[in-house]
């Protein structure tokens, strides 16, 4: 953990506080101390110059959700370059996105499953269900109740295969987005109980 001194100071080039918002990417040089649990920043600066995310309430709401999901679910301390690259790229993609913003949190959750180890394990075929227990698409309705419907399974497939720049082409209305988010959270919850502690889901459902 690192401590930032003078975060609210208005001296110099402005307050550092503006850099520490949900999902803002920063680069920093730190000073580690063997005598203290909290290390210190020597220098901190913006890693990605964000053009729209700080000013768009839809994007900032999604960023809050992304930050909480990662905080709740990612507990590893060792470096994970693939996960870092995905998150870094996701922030840049969200900032650059003009259309399809309302689908972005769904795309993020679907593709984050790849990095967390429970991406669907086989190919999708039209009309398939998704068996949450097995983590795979199936042409037959599972006998247990832990599954995604054929509609939700198709959306999961579309989100996994879609380039983030084209997520507007996945046509979902508000009711469908709410229902699919609930379904995706059930899938996550089967693998990671901590997803149920994410509070920003309610805000997402109000905005989208």
Describe each PLM feature range.
Residues 1-208:
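Non-catalytic alpha-helical scaffolds and adjoining flexible linkers that form interface surfaces
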């Amino acid at each position: 953990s690192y401590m930032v001194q003078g975060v609210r100071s208005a001296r110099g080039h402005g307050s550092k506080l503006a850099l520490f918002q949900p999902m803002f990417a920063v680069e920093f040089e730190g000073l580690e101390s063997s005598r203290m649990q909290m290390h210190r920043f020597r220098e901190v600066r913006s890693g990605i110059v964000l053009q729209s995310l700080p000013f768009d309430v839809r994007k900032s709401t999604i960023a809050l959700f992304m930050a909480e999901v990662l905080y709740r679910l990612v507990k590893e301390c060792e470096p994970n370059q693939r996960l870092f690259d995905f998150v870094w790229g996701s922030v840049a993609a969200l900032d650059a996105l003009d259309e399809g913003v309302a689908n972005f949190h769904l795309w993020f959750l679907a593709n984050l499953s790849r990095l967390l180890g429970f991406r669907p394990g086989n190919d999708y075929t039209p009309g398939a269900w998704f068996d949450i227990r097995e983590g795979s698409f199936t042409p037959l309705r599972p006998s247990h109740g832990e599954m995604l419907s054929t509609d939700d399974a198709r959306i999961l497939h579309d989100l996994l295969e879609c380039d983030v720049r084209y997520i507007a082409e996945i046509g979902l209305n508000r009711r469908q987005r709410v229902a699919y988010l609930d379904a995706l959270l059930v899938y996550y919850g089967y693998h990671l109980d901590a997803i149920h502690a994410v509070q920003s889901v309610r805000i997402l459902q109000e905005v989208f």
